[in-house]
Amino acid sequence: MGVPSPTPLSSLLLLLLILGTRCYARQVHVPRGPLYRVAGTAVSISCNVSDYEGPAQQDFEWFMYRPEAPATSLGIVSTKDSQFSYAVFGPRVASGDLQVQRLKGDSVVLKIARLQAQDSGFYECYTPSTDTQYLGNYSAKVELRVLPDELQVSAAPPGPRGRQAATSPSRLTVHEGQELALGCLAQTKTKKHTHLSVSFGRAIPEAPVGRATLQEVVGLRSDMAVEAGAPYAERLASGELRLSKEGTDRYRMVVGGAQAGDSGTYHCTAAEWIQDPDGSWVQVAEKRAVLAHVDVQTLSSQLAVTVGPGERRIGPGEPLELLCNVSGALPPPGRHAAYSVGWEMAPAGAPGPGRLVAQLDTEGIGSLGPGYEDRHIAMEKVASRTYRLRLEAARPADAGTYRCLAKAYVRGSGTRLREAASARSRPLPVHVREEGVVLEAVAWLAGGTVYRGETASLLCNISVRGGPPGLRLAASWWVERPEEGELSSGPAQLVGGVGQDGVAELGVRPGGGPVSVELVGPRSHRLRLHGLGPEDEGIYHCAPSAWVQHADYSWYQAGSARSGPVTVYPYTHAVDTLFVPLLVGTGVALVTGASVLATITCCFMKRMRKR
């Protein structure tokens, strides 16, 4: 009998049996090519194997095929044979310029530390078989093309159209608050389509340059996105830090409002990027150039203030002029910096800088300090950095030590001003002669005794010794009332007075009744309290003062005094003391009579009910 022919079902079962006993087919993988890299840079080409039999650690061998001999393989390096390299690659393998690095058992990477033009060609990754059957592929090739280094980076000279960089890095001195502007020229002539990224960085003064010491300030990424280093992110967001591209190859960084921490050596780093066949962008070249050594001079180290013309001795009513000079290597006031200047005065022997007399703010607007609003005082800028304070008529109270205070401001983002420095001058003594006015006052209660409801008249006689012609007197009346339950009196309250200009001023009378104050003689004043009441009881005194008027029509107090105490006690009239018992007796009699009448009426009504 003949052998039966296989049926389709049996053939299918046989095929499944064969596939079930053998499911391995070795695959070697390398990146898709061609890969474009730049001479002088490093490259890493990965290789891994899958679907293999045998040990987990596989061996790898790398070969190269040069364009001029595409059929000739040149052994580069192997994971199992240290003598594998051909003579042309031996020195580079020995120096580490060419090496294979194992990532894991079935994956390695070929590393070339510094590409050369003759490294262009096909690279083959081969894996010796450890399989029971020869299935799949045991090698894979990728093309590497080495491009010449066409990347150029240099410092851009000042001016928007500059092209030639200086032979050595410049040294720039920038004042705090000013703009720091640096330019960088970066271009490539590579024939392939590439992108450039440009980054501005700063290294602290005298620090070696490297990735560890170079702090990125701001950079333009390969996708044209602008990003800042972490310490500068806020300044970029506020617009204080800017980066722009001008033309095809010029990049400009502007740091507004330079700070002390901005000092250092600035570099420009340009990187060239190319897109691999797998769609990823890879950096293929990088170069760095020193732009400038920048020194930011802080305003606090430069600001200085001097005053003149020296110690002053003047008489009352004379003008007082003081000059203040602000010096130092300072930026002019304007878009980046502003200044304010003021004068302070402290009485002789008083601690601290004193109180403000007058000042010019950052806008040049003048203002007077507390207590000087009614004075004829001028504060003005008489030269570029010279300021003058003028008091039209000095007073003895103006004597003391004067200091000039200057403040420097820098403008941050927008129009916001930030105080950066301040300086005070040395003290300048000013002496103003006293007028020599001596006042004495004697006050008394006319009549000696006053009763409730009457008018109390208090008189005050003033005597004057010394003083200039035209001296005028003023007098005011004050009362200290005894506080309830206290032995001592409360604070003095103004009752009334007459000023040096003859105008009466009325205060608050304790009893609330009418008050009159008047000048009854050249140096005699009178206070009258009408309708005296018990609330007017207290201790009164007269307080005269001497006033001098200067040519600028301002008044100043040249002297003062205080009289002795005058006790005002409103007595009660004798008839009033008799009238009180009468009222009390009448009241008691009425109450007693009413009580008796009520008792009799009550008893009578009870008897009527019983009947």
Swiss-Prot record:
InterPro entries: Ig-like_dom, Ig-like_dom_sf, Ig-like_fold, Ig_sub, Ig_V-set, IgSF_V-set/TM_domain
SMART domains associated with the record: IG
Compartmental location: Cell membrane
Membrane topology label: Single-pass membrane protein
Residue numbers on the Extracellular membrane side: 26-577
GO cellular component, one term: membrane
Topology Cytoplasmic: residue spans: 599-611
Domain Ig-like C2-type, first and last residues per copy: 26-143, 160-284, 301-422, 429-554
Keyword Transferase: no
Disulphide bonds in the chain: 47-125, 184-268, 324-404, 460-542
Role this protein plays: Member of the immunoglobulin superfamily (IgSF) that links tetraspanin-enriched microdomains to the actin cytoskeleton and plays several important roles in innate and adaptive immunity. Acts as an inducible receptor of HSPA8 on dendritic cells to enhance the CCL21/SLC-dependent migration of activated mature dendritic cells while attenuating their antigen-specific stimulatory capacities. In complex with alpha-actinins ACTN1 and ACTN4, regulates actin dynamics in the immune synapse and subsequent T-cell activation. Inhibits the entry of several viruses such as hepatitis C Virus (HCV) or HIV-1.
Subunit structure as annotated in this protein's UniProt entry: Interacts directly with CD82 and CD9/tetraspanin-29. Also interacts with integrin alpha-3/beta-1 and integrin alpha-4/beta-1. Part of a complex composed of CD9, PTGFRN and CD81. Interacts with CD81/tetraspanin-28.
Name of the protein in its database record: Immunoglobulin superfamily member 8
Lineage, uppermost ranks: Eukaryota, Metazoa, Chordata, Craniata, Vertebrata
The gene coding this protein: Igsf8
